[in-house]
């Protein structure tokens, strides 16, 4: 649905005026309308199956191009490969399919000028490290693993990216909500209720951020923007006002105290 909406908006605009990234790894087919599917509210009436093979990636890519009204994609992410989504057994099969034929299909798409770059879009670091041992990736979109609360992408993964020149895009920088809302009742962390030790950690970092002249959300965003391994930061929003608030936070003039605070946070990596 998002691709169809975006495609309708962009179809009459010059293609060189914008950059599009999208995902492969799930193949859609017509299905019944459901109010909620895998956390998505009122999705387009499709059935979805995971398929990381070359055939599945090609099918998913071509369907995305059709919905987006374009014949090429700038960045193509292989989405949700890993144990986090599939569990140990299923991920083993999916990863084997991807390495056997999926990677070659991505390379063909790039050689044919259909995509400019490809990589992973995931919520865990281990699958990135595992795949990078076999494949040179252009980019990785890592969600929630390089933030004020979770530094698990740092060290080994960031080091590998620097060594081979893989760009790192940071998503999920608010850890699904709590670093934007603060430790309030109902706050979410990693798509679920925030546990007490996370609530306590957020309270402490918010106090220090405020002392440096930053809101909690500003601190989370500026940390991501200033991290030395960050090529770009992905912000998701469902409201115009929250988008504007995030843009204002990204463009905030940083005082010496604020920069010193961010530097201390980075030094803890």
Give the location of each predicted region.
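Short, flexible, mixed-charge acidic loops at enzyme active sites
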Residues: 30-40, 183-187
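Active-site mouth loops of central-metabolism enzymes
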Residues: 42-58, 90-92
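Active-site groove signature of glycoside hydrolases
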Residues: 65-88
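Short acidic capping loops at alpha-helix termini that bridge into adjacent secondary structure
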Residues: 15-18, 71-75, 117, 138-139, ...
């Amino acid at each position: 649905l998002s691709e169809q909406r975006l495609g309708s908006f962009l179809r009459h605009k010059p293609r060189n005026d914008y950059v599009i990234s999208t995902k492969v790894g799930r193949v859609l087919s017509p299905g019944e309308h459901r109010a909620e599917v895998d956390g998505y509210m009122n999705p387009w009436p499709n059935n979805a199956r995971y398929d990381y093979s070359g055939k599945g990636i090609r099918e998913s890519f071509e369907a995305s191009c059709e919905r987006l009204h374009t014949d090429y994609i700038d960045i193509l992410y292989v989405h949700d490969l890993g144990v986090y989504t599939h569990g140990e057994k299923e991920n083993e099969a999916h990863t084997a399919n991807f390495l056997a034929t999926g990677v070659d299909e991505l390379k063909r798409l790039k050689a044919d000028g259909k995509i400019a770059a490809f990589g992973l879009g995931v919520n865990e670091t281990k699958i990135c490290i595992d795949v990078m041992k076999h494949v040179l990736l252009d980019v990785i979109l890592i969600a929630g693993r390089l933030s004020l609360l979770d530094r698990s992408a740092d060290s080994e993964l960031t080091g590998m990216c620097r060594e081979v020149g893989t760009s790192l895009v940071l998503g999920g920088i608010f850890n699904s909500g709590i670093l934007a809302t603060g430790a309030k009742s109902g706050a979410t962390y990693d798509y679920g209720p925030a546990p007490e030790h996370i609530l306590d950690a957020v309270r402490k970092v918010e106090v220090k951020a405020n002392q440096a002249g930053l809101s909690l959300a500003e601190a989370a965003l500026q940390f991501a923007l200033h991290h030395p391994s960050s090529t770009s930061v992905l912000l998701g929003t469902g409201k115009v006002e929250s988008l504007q608030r995030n843009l204002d936070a990204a463009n905030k003039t940083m005082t010496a105290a604020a920069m010193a605070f961010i530097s201390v946070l980075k030094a803890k990596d």
